[in-house]
Regions:
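Interfacial/gating helices of multi-pass transporter permease domains
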Residues: 11, 37-60, 122-128, 190-191, ...
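Interhelical loop/hinge segments that connect adjacent transmembrane helices in multipass membrane
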Residues: 1-16, 126, 188-197, 206-248
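Membrane-interface helix-loop junctions in multi-pass transport and translocation proteins
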Residues: 169-205, 318
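Residue-level signature of transmembrane alpha-helical cores of multipass secondary-active transporters
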Residues: 15-23, 56-57, 95, 134, ...
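Alpha-helical transmembrane segments and their helix-entry boundary regions
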Residues: 46-49, 65, 157-163, 193-194, ...
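Alpha-helical transmembrane segments of multi-pass membrane proteins
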Residues: 108, 121-147, 275-279, 318
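Membrane-interface helix-capping segments at transmembrane helix termini in multi-pass transporters
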Residues: 47, 81-89, 105-133
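Small-residue-rich hydrophobic transmembrane alpha-helices
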Residues: 47-100, 144-153, 268-317
């Protein structure tokens, strides 16, 4: 019992609580979007939005290969401002470049992919338009995630909380003006979700980049950018990405495609949002806590593991 108690005391429970609040914010505006789509006329809104589920699985493969290793590499460079600044600049170029290439590929082959995934012919055209808009939003999204990792690495955790709440507020406002059926809304339907994501992700990314610039991490200097660290980055990322590739591709073919075959993509999308947004929130945020703690202190693996298992057990019991 003493070992468990000591391990729990070593876990940053305050940060875990903050992560829960951070995770709750996107869950709230996702739930609001489900409500707005439910108010739209016709039966296809959920089905069209549901097509993004398997598209996000493709992006998740790249995300886990990029974002997860970043916690380690950004954390390890924090003591050297020049090294951190170089990794920040080159990391933005690499992650943005990879996502841009992937998005271009998805935009070009959206309709063949929808046909392969057995989407209903009645919604292929509308779904293709929505997926293309979201593909642009995903590029802005990965850049936002990257700079948020940078804020955590330099110890500006409170700003991350602020921007998470701001994202919730901005999404509610833009969704209301773009998606809702209110008199002043543009009534863009499902496509409004994609436009909302582009607007919010872009604005927040620009603001955070300005903050990092004022902190002295994005100043222009004569020092040549070095991509040498990317060799180790890609080695670690490839392992994480390979595991995610096998898992997500199998899920796409065995679950997502089957859902389209039986014509229940809309129901699946709503249920999936509830499960991942509400039921699994504590477990997902615990994972974020572990990544942050281990990236800054490798000894946390030894001292906190028992505490992590205890928290997980408590969550499962609840």
């Amino acid at each position: 019992m003493n070992k468990i108690k000591n391990s729990l005391q070593s876990v940053n429970l305050k940060f875990f609580a903050a992560l829960l609040v951070m995770g709750l914010c996107p869950t709230i505006y996702t739930t609001l979007r489900v409500f707005f789509l439910g108010q739209l006329p016709g039966d296809w809104a959920y089905s069209i939005a549901g097509q993004l589920s398997w598209v996000n699985l493709i992006y998740e493969i790249i995300s886990e290969a990029i974002i997860l290793p970043l916690f380690f590499f950004m954390g390890s460079a924090i003591l050297n401002k020049d090294d951190f600044s170089n990794k920040l600049k080159t990391g933005l170029i690499v992650s943005g470049g990879i996502y841009t290439i992937l998005s271009i590929g998805i935009i070009l082959f959206t309709e063949p992919l929808l046909t392969f995934m057995a989407a209903s012919p009645d919604i292929i055209k509308e779904s293709a338009t929505y997926i293309r808009i979201e593909s642009v939003a995903n590029v802005a999204g990965v850049l936002l995630n990257f700079v948020l990792v940078a804020l955590i690495a330099i110890g500006r955790d409170k700003l991350v909380y602020v921007f998470t709440v701001l994202k919730l507020a901005f999404c509610v406002v833009t969704d209301t003006f773009l998606i809702s059926t209110l008199p002043f809304s543009l009534n863009l339907g499902v496509n409004g979700i994609g436009y909302s994501n582009i607007i919010v992700n872009t604005i927040l990314t620009i603001v955070i980049l300005m903050i990092l610039s004022k902190e002295g991490y994005l100043v222009r200097d004569k020092q040549k950018l070095s991509f040498a660290w990317c060799k180790d980055f890609f080695k670690i990322g490839s392992v994480s990405g390979l595991e995610s590739f096998v898992r997500n591709i199998a899920y796409m073919l065995m679950v997502s495609r089957m859902v389209n075959v039986v014509g229940e993509s809309g129901v699946y999308w709503v249920a999936n949002n509830f499960i991942w947004g509400w039921m699994l929130l504590p477990v997902l945020q615990l994972g974020e806590l572990i990544k942050q703690e281990v990236s800054t202190d490798k000894n946390k693996v030894k001292t906190n593991t028992l505490g992590y298992f205890t928290i997980t057990t408590f969550i499962c019991i609840l």
